[in-house]
Amino acid sequence: MLYRAAAHTRQVPVLVDHRVLEGGSDLTVMEYLRPVSVAEGAAFHRSIAGREPAVAALAAHIDTVHARGAREQPWWGPLDDNPANVLRGADGRLVVADLFFADGPALYATVRDDPDRIVRDYPEHLRRHMTELPLGSSGGWPDGDAERMRHGLAAADRRLRG
């Protein structure tokens, strides 16, 4: 949504294709982008956070999309200000990508502790790959944890179906 809404700013990647895949995954194809230095990425994020004139339109689009995500998605996370999310297009311009994410630690704690809530909030067809995603900030899953979560969700699905 952000890439389409903010395309006119040229501060987001050019979206070549986007498809919602079976099982709750998405495939996003965008223009080729190159990494920038950590300092340059952090500076771009600071300019967005400060609503500097050069990025004010982009910041407004980010706010709109982020607010919608928070309304529509349980366990919506804060904006990701990782400097690695700032990249450079072939034409030299800076773009920001991958700003939105789920609050993984809270989400997966709920999967473990209250799988019935997850089953109510996320239909089965949208969470097929839920336990296949890594937790970027905390590494991989402890041995057997993903399997225990899958079993807990399957049992909650059976309870919901009656």
At which residue positions do the language-model features occur?
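Short N-terminal edge-element motif at the start of the domain
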Residues: 1-5
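N-terminal cationic-hydrophobic initiation segments that often serve targeting/anchoring roles
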Residues: 6-7, 70
